[in-house]
């Protein structure tokens, strides 16, 4: 309730109000009480309640009625209310009793005294005064009490109102009540009550305030919501109070201020969030605990199983011992019997020997018993060790769970399986070891039995079973200590340690077989060491090196705790960050270096022995060929996905993979025992597509070149690999000269560098028949060459893959090193490195571009060496497969995620198909590269195939440039650093290595630094959107939307920054073009097409398009509209030529929406085409601007402009140009058209001078003074007349009504100008506006009207007439005046419209025809007055012209019937009024309300105002629309003048009061002002464009003049009050300006 504010203001008044009425009553009583009362009532000096009752609707009753007692009880305690009321009542009662009772007693006493004393007069008077004083004192006291009661009531009221207001605002009483210390429940109850009461208040107050009525709907909605606030707040408060954590917050907020419902809801939301987080934590904890519990259960079960297995084994061993003992006993019995017989026979001879033999047997038996005991001990020890291992596993599991709760489920599964397998394998090993020993003693039968027993034993998820044969090599001594078991298990773990995902995928057979091979190795080492291995001693094992992902793991006899950790780290290698990955790569590289060549041969032996070990990573028992095929399948779908929309590319990519397979298979000799060379090739290929592309291109080259590139797929793959190799090449080649974006990717990566190299190399590569094939061939040769050269330099071919691998790994760790190495090893190795690394770091880019020529030079040499080196390269590639065991699987993931259809685009494909493919693919590939994170061990060269030059450039044109600006140079930013292992993680700069970050940050600048030579200017202007525009035309063809958007963005910048400059620059050309249209109209496109064509040029001819920047010069020379020389390249512009280029004009077209369409075509034509001197609004035009400056006093100064963007043309002229183009002129006589042309030219010149005077102060008027303005003006007029003729011929775009004749009354005008030059001060004032004697005016009018007849046809040339000299304009005006005089009656109906353009006429007709008629009449009267003035005498010549024009106007009057109302206010009528007004100038102020023109002002003042006001023409157009008046077109000269100085006249329109000062203006002055006032017709022209009439075309030029000079007048129109200070210019100043304006006319 906002009403409380009113009571607050009222309260100050009402609280003290009631005393004053009593004061006034007391004042009437006696002087003494007055003094007393004044002393007492100083505090209440406000008006009395009686005199000032509260306003209606704000009385206390208004607030008192709606408040029920229940609320008062709530807000103010009942006790307090009762106390206040009782105290107030007691005070009142006591005071009243005292007053009245005392008065009554005193009266009795006085009566008694009077009766007793005899009623003396003095006593009576004194007693009366005393009584009065007592009454007054008592009354004052009563008044005070009443005031106190009223104040208390009002305060209570105000409290109630404020409380209701607070309720209405936030229902925030809750906090206040809390501050009062009340409970939340009571607060809620009160709030509910208050809400109800508040609704009651609303219902009552709605009827009393309109504001409340306007907001009834909102308040009803509020009322509906308030119903729910009670319950809501109850719940909220209960919820908040229930949470102690938030109580402090609620308290602080309640103390600080009343929190809104939103804050409370926010609190609740926070509480819910906290609870949700707690619940989530609890759930997570529960899950973790459950997982732990399950793990413990599994461990417990495993322990139980192990226990049962061990017990079973102990039983078995015991049974075996029993069997052995029984057999021995039997043998001993048998042997004893036989020996007894023999002994009996030979007892005599052999008795000592027999004893000895029996002793030996006993010893043997004892030894065997000891052995059995030791075996028993070993078994017991193994049992203990197994139990300890189980405990260790538990601890490890707990540790793992603690570290990685998230990964726990997966790890728990895998670890449960591992632990079970470990325990089982250990138990089985122990079982197997015992059977081995027993087998050695008892025979092979035991072996079979034990193996059968083991197979029969229960097995749970065993990853591998140890064949007894695998353990046979271990001597029985190794089992005497249980330390051997951890060694074997560790060895098995090290072998089988792999990502748990792969283990899950692995089949039991493959892993069981995999374990066989590794166990042989420890068996050999154990055979070498017959003694038990100590725990610290590590067995002699091969290093299990995984260069791509895995650290080489050495098998050692360390406890299983550490080994399990190692296996876990190996399984977690996938998730390692780039730093860990770098470390792994470095270690792998060091190991590779140590291994050297032996690693390859070792790998061969390993493949024979432990190929299954590596299959643990790949999980395939099949041949390497099958494994490779799977990798290639992963490849194929990846490429397939990348190029599914582009089947050709997909087919290529598949072809490339299959090619590599087939080719490597063809080279079976190189495949050796490795499966297929393509196996290693496939693995490596994904490790780095650069290396793949090398191996593929190399193998393919060996295959395809040896096979002659049999299939297109091979050729395409060759091109792909070549492009991969030459991604750095092709972009460099491509960007310079390809019209089709070959470079797209490379251009993105290294667009700038590529530009320079591209031009140089682009010609070479493009000159070839199918550059794709040749380049692919060259690159395919070069790739093997690179590998060859590197291999040669390193001394052998096989290590090349290691070098490639190490280099690829180094390329991530130290790509810069690899780049330097590649440079050292030659451009070929450099290309190889760039391929293998895929990095194509800026160095590799530049080197690749350089390498192009070098590769071409060495092509023949290297081709010869290709066949030689190709085989070792393949071998190396094959070796690489096993180094990168998981590359196939990784590559599948990457292949799925990498949509690089490595774009092995068919050379045979049409450029268009390639274009379509290429456009979409590069972006996807880039995105995918970004998605990849450089965590994997294998350096994945993101194999951007720059399709041969045709399509790279298609996408190149916009994407590379945009990326250059954005700095997203993916190619330069080392795409290769993104390894295959972590495709899921984005290669964001945060994830990249610091090197990679550096490259990523550098790449944009590097790319920006280099631009194609044709785009040289764009280099300086890096961030201008025009760079993107200027790249190439195909951009618009393929992606018109993108280019259009870019263009519009650029234009938006220009609009924001230099819109005004562009407008100003364009307008002079528009003016010029209007003059020039006649000559070049044939060559010009039509207005609708010209604008679009220009935009297409700006988009399409981007090579030529101007890159617009803030510091750039927008003006350049146009050699051709369609063949645009690069606009930015030309900083300077020759003065005489049209400076605006088509591209800029198109931009300006978009910028200047209102600008006439004709101007766009006109701008392009240089002014030289015109034989006559064109009026150049620009500073340094070849045409003599010497006479164009308006200020004679200022010496001409060269104008040096940093940018052509800012034109010297006034905004009024620009708007005139805008409006004039679309006008539909009415046909009139040719003479009138000529007059209008001259008027237009004169106005333009005057405007030019005004603008130039403001801007540069250049003035060639001095020359005119020396030479005589007459000659210059005559020459210019005569020269301009043919222009008008040409305009008439060529201005197809002009409306027929605007067509103007070439005939000119310029001679008379010139004569009049000469007269004006020679006139005295007073005469000059009149002559400034060219209004000469009435006779001259009549002559001009007589001549003019015939011309005005043609104006109907050529009304569009009113603009050109505006370019006419002021003399021509004056002649027209004078002619019109004479005509108006002769045709006053007719003109009252018709002629006024005739002189105005159709648009202006319509505006005048529709807006204020009656007003215009009145104004025209006044103007006519004033003109008559001016004619009477001595200064008007020279106007006779102009009057003659006007008389001539009258005849023409009479012809115009017929079509102008609709505008007759405006014409009724002809200048003749105005002159009449002026004649009357001379005498009645004093009375004119009264008429000023009707008379809009500042006729009182001298012509010089008006001219000055015109000159000064001209700079505001832009406002004039806007305001001119407001000034539909200026009705008299015959007064157009006055209107023209008024257009210049029209701000005054317009203010007169609005104010009219100001006129009396200006009413004294001479006829010329008034006409000038009227003429100035016409600038409104410019807007009229816009509006009148609807009106086809434009009956007085002469007036339209005058309006245009006013538009040029009108800006001030426009301000006067809109503001009315603001008039230029120059309105009161002296006649001399006005004369000077007019002379300057005349001189400026060419």
From Swiss-Prot:
Keywords: Coiled coil, Leucine-rich repeat, Repeat
LRR repeat locations: 161-184, 1310-1333
Coiled coil start-end: 279-330
Region of interest (Disordered), ranges: 21-51
InterPro entries in the cross-refs: CCDC7
Additional remark text: Oncogene that drives tumor growth via increasing proliteration and cell survival.
Protein name: Coiled-coil domain-containing protein 7A
Organism for this UniProt entry: Mus musculus (Mouse)
UniProt lineage: Eukaryota, Metazoa, Chordata, Craniata, Vertebrata
Gene name linked to the record: Ccdc7a
